[in-house]
Every structure is written in structure tokens, then in C-alpha cells.
């Protein structure tokens, strides 16, 4: 996808349309959906401004407040998928203040650029796939039918018939399991990540590049023909792509369309500044400030400006309040939205409405074994009631509770499915109660199982 088509896609995605798309996957939380839809539209509006004014318009970062499992991450991830934007999710607690052992906050920007680079690279590889396939086919045939030369160094033509015969077999898949020895490019040496002072990740990348030059660039491998074709196609596609152009496009996308989702931001909020572990947490907040305000981060693909990256902070804020963040950081998240805890009615909708609804997933999974599930309305009601009850009695983990409830409910059917081929199983309220009622009553047991 080119920058132009990305801009065109943004133009089509009006705030209403964005909310409609998000509704396909996330139930409720209208306020949060509206906030991200407006933030997305403002990106397109900014692209339309004169350049001198464009640089003045900075994205309004969003702070999502709400318990776990209510859709914070899903809203941000679906938004990024909608516009094919680079997206990374990081946890605020994984970072340490500059000068301490651990990851420095700039690494989140480097991760974003890496994601952006891989996205652009895959798009470019799709464009050259047909040509790469033809070139890979020729290389593979060279291995299967080595060229014969005359004493004068002229290639003999008699191998042409054999070559064409093998080409047809190759395309039909008749040679897939045959073993062939090919010469492949050696991958970069894997290195174990080391926790250390800031900048070490960048140094690690440079060392990898140096070592890759010292190690033989090619080696011979024996693989099946099917795998050989894939390896050679990948190599040929990479040769056809201008990696410098990919890097430039990746940086542009990361700078102008990138989204960084900072989860558990409430865990670095400090109630009593200047004491105990709060000192380090406050340090992480201060290290985040320049990135949120706009700075330049050096990456292996080139310098990246963070001025127009959209940051979405998220946290439950049970133990702390947004006002416990340092004032400067609070100011960097001008848009605040509160996500509501999920109710039984929400659970009922989550089970059936989204395109990736859990009931639909289980129906399709078991259909592969020729086992047909049917969920009645009273079963959906009962599953939702049980999920809400367990969330109330134990830890409230939101919609994630439905996964554990459904897994336990269908455990026996999933286990015995191969022997149940051709059967249709009706899941009704009676079935749900029989499987789960005792577990729900036993609070201690439900803590461990559900």
C-alpha cells in the first residue's frame, strides 16, 4: 500500500464509519470508540493542511481508564488494522529510568519502526511475488537439471526438454517431496538480548550486522523441493526490492500514522513522590515526556521523529488516579475516556454479535470434525450470567472470563469430537448448568478453574 492509498483510505474512514467498523469486534464502549475515531480523522485533516501549519498540529494523545478485559487494547489494535498502520503494545512497567538496568523508553519507538518496516516490506514483496516466483523456479531447475556444456563452453540444448518436463511436474506439485541441495543465504547470527544501560539495544543491532559480515554469507542445505521453492522465492523477492526505499516509507508511516499503546500506565503513577520504588517510577514518567512531546530517536533504519505518533495510554487506575501521574505527563494525554465494566447484557452481546464472536469460533472449530454445535438463547443467557457472577465473586477480568467459561463448558465435546462425527449437539441452559453450576457454587474451585 502506497502513502497515497493510505491517505485515500483515511479519507474514506469518517468517524461514523470507524465506529461502525469497531462495532463489528468490540461491544459497547462508545465513548472510547468516538475518541479514537476523532483522533484518526484528525490525522487525515492534518495531511490536508499547508506544510507550515501541518507541523504545528500535534496528535491529541488518549488516556483510556477502565478495568482489564473491557476492550482497551482491542479498540486500539482494531483501529490500527483498519488503516494498516504500524502498531505496538508495550507495558509501562517493563521500562526503567535512564541509568538503571533494563529497557529504555526509546525502545518502544524502535519497535514501532521495526513493525512498520516489516509491513512495508511484505507489501513490496507481494508486488514482486510473480516475478520472484519465476526467478525462483529457474534457480530451482538449475539445481535439479545442472546445465551441460560442450568442450567449447556452449550450453547443450538437449537438457531443455528435460528441464521443461521437470518444470511441469514442479508446477503440478509432483516433485514436492523430492530432496534437493540448494545454496542459501545465511541468516544473521542470533544473539541473546542483554539487559543494560540505554543504547545497548542499538549497539546489539550494530554488532549483529558486523558479525553477519564475518560469517560465510552462503551455505548448502538439503531440503524438500516445496520448501526450496519458498526459500528461493523469498531470496529473489528481497533482491527485487529497494530496501532503502522500504526504510524511508517505513519511517514515514511510523512518524505520521504510527500508534503506540502504553498499557498499565497506572502502575508507574506515584502517590507519594520521592520515596521508595516511586523514585524509579517517577523517573520512567519523566523519560516518557520527551517522546510524548516530540523528539528524535535513532533507529537502525534512520532517525525517527515522534512528534506525530499517536500514543494511547491505558490502565485500570484501581490503586492510583490519573492525577497521581506527574502533571507534565497528565498534560500529554488531553483526551480521557472511561471504559465501563462489562455487565451480563454486554456478555450476551459479546457471545453472539461480533464477527469473531466466541460461539462462532467454537462452531467453526468443531465443524472441522463434522460436529455441529447449536447455542440456544437461554444457553447464551446462562453463560453470560455465570461469567458475570464469577467476575463479581473473584477477580473481575472482563470479557476474558468468557474464554475460560466456554473452554470448560465445551471441554468434553472438544476432547471426544473425533468420535462424535456427524452429530449435532444442542447447547441449552440445562446443558450449561449441568457442566458449570457446581463449579460456580464452589467459590474456591471457581477461582482456580474458571
Swiss-Prot record:
Its main location: cytoplasm. GO terms for molecular function: ATP binding; ATP hydrolysis activity; peptidase activity; proteasome-activating activity. InterPro entries: AAA+_ATPase, ATP-dep_Clp_protease_ClpX, ATPase_AAA_core, Clp_ATPase_C, HslU, P-loop_NTPase. ATP binds at residues 27, 69-74, 263, 328, 400. Keywords: ATP-binding, Chaperone, Cytoplasm, Nucleotide-binding. It holds the Pfam family AAA. The keyword Cytoplasm applies. It is found in: Cytoplasm. It comes from the Bacteria. One of its GO terms (biological process) is proteolysis involved in protein catabolic process. One of its GO terms (cellular component) is HslUV protease complex. Coiled coil: none annotated. Belongs to the ClpX chaperone family. HslU subfamily. ATPase subunit of a proteasome-like degradation complex; this subunit has chaperone activity. The binding of ATP and its subsequent hydrolysis by HslU are essential for unfolding of protein substrates subsequently hydrolyzed by HslV. HslU recognizes the N-terminal part of its protein substrates and unfolds these before they are guided to HslV for hydrolysis. A double ring-shaped homohexamer of HslV is capped on each side by a ring-shaped HslU homohexamer. The assembly of the HslU/HslV complex is dependent on binding of ATP. This is ATP-dependent protease ATPase subunit HslU. The lineage of its organism: Bacteria, Pseudomonadati, Aquificota, Aquificia, Aquificales. The gene is hslU.
Amino acid at each position: 500500500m502506497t502513502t497515497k492509498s493510505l491517505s485515500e483510505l483515511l479519507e474514506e474512514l469518517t468517524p461514523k464509519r470507524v465506529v461502525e467498523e469497531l462495532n463489528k469486534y468490540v461491544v459497547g464502549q462508545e465513548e472510547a470508540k468516538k475518541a479514537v475515531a476523532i483522533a484518526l480523522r484528525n490525522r487525515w485533516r492534518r495531511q490536508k493542511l499547508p506544510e507550515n501549519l501541518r507541523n504545528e498540529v500535534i496528535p491529541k494523545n488518549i488516556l483510556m481508564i477502565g478495568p482489564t478485559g473491557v476492550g482497551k487494547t482491542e479498540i486500539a489494535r482494531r483501529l490500527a488494522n483498519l488503516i494498516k498502520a504500524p502498531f505496538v503494545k508495550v507495558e509501562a512497567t517493563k521500562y526503567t529510568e535512564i541509568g538503571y538496568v533494563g529497557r529504555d523508553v526509546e525502545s518502544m519507538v524502535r519497535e514501532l519502526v521495526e513493525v512498520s518496516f516489516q509491513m512495508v516490506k511484505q507489501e513490496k514483496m507481494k508486488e514482486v511475488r510473480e516475478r520472484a516466483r519465476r526467478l525462483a523456479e529457474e534457480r530451482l531447475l538449475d539445481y535439479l537439471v545442472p546445465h551441460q556444456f560442450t568442450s567449447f563452453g556452449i550450453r547443450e540444448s538437449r537438457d531443455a526438454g528435460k528441464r521443461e518436463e521437470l518444470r511441469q511436474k514442479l508446477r503440478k506439485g509432483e516433485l514436492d517431496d523430492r530432496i534437493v541441495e540448494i545454496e542459501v543465504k545465511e541468516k544473521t547470527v542470533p544473539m541473546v538480548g542483554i539487559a543494560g544501560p540505554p543504547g545497548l539495544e542499538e549497539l546489539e543491532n550494530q554488532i549483529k550486522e558486523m558479525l553477519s559480515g564475518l560469517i560465510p554469507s552462503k551455505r548448502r542445505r538439503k531440503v524438500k523441493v516445496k520448501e526450496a521453492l519458498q526459500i528461493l522465492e523469498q531470496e529473489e523477492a528481497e533482491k527485487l526490492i529497494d530496501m532503502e526505499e522500504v526504510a524511508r516509507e517505513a519511517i514515514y508511516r511510523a512518524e505520521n500514522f504510527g500508534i503506540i499503546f502504553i498499557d498499565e500506565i497506572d502502575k508507574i503513577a506515584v502517590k507519594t513522590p520521592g520515596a521508595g520504588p516511586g523514585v524509579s517510577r517517577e523517573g520512567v514518567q519523566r523519560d516518557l515526556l520527551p517522546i510524548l512531546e516530540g523528539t528524535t530517536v535513532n533507529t537502525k533504519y534512520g532517525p525517527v521523529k515522534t512528534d506525530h505518533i499517536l500514543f494511547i495510554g491505558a490502565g485500570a487506575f484501581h490503586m492510583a488516579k490519573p492525577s497521581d501521574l506527574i502533571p507534565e505527563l497528565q498534560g500529554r494525554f488531553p483526551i480521557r475516556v472511561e471504559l465501563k465494566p462489562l455487565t451480563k447484557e454486554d456478555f450476551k452481546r459479546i457471545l453472539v454479535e461480533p464477527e469473531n464472536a466466541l460461539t462462532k469460533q467454537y462452531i467453526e472449530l468443531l465443524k472441522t470434525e463434522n460436529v455441529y454445535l447449536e447455542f440456544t438463547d437461554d444457553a447464551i443467557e446462562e453463560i453470560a450470567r455465570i461469567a458475570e457472577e464469577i467476575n463479581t465473586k473473584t477477580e473481575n477480568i472482563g470479557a476474558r472470563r468468557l474464554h475460560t467459561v466456554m473452554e470448560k463448558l465445551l471441554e468434553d465435546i472438544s476432547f471426544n469430537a473425533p468420535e462424535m462425527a456427524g452429530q449435532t449437539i444442542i447447547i441449552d441452559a440445562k446443558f450449561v448448568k449441568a457442566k458449570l453450576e457446581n463449579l460456580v457454587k464452589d467459590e474456591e474451585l471457581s477461582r482456580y478453574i474458571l
